[in-house]
């Protein structure tokens, strides 16, 4: 997926894929969430997030209700660190950011 946000290009095909988090629901469930953390060549981080109609990724439908969607969310380095701490293993954190001091 490619998307321009604030005059910056975010591209999942050219960025480095760090790791992926999925919640416990099946991918056809309206509560399903899948988020992948990427790092661009310039060091910026972003999430490619997708989810069902009962998640933070939902989008309104034209005729009412909601549907699932996929979006790109730019992250500061501090937000990326917090996301990794919350969703991934300590090993991924160390490989990505180094040891916690």
Q: What spans do the regions from the language model cover?
A:
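Secondary-structure transition motif
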Residues: 1-101
């Amino acid at each position: 997926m490619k998307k321009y946000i604030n005059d910056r290009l975010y591209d999942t095909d050219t960025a480095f894929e760090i790791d992926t988090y999925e919640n416990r629901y099946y991918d056809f469930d309206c509560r399903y969430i899948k988020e992948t953390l990427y790092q661009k060549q310039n060091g910026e981080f972003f999430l490619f997030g997708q989810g069902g109609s009962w998640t933070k990724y939902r989008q309104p439908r034209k005729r009412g209700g909601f549907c699932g969607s996929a979006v790109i969310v730019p992250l500061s380095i501090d937000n990326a660190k917090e996301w990794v701490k919350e969703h991934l293993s300590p090993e991924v954190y160390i490989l990505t950011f180094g040891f916690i001091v």
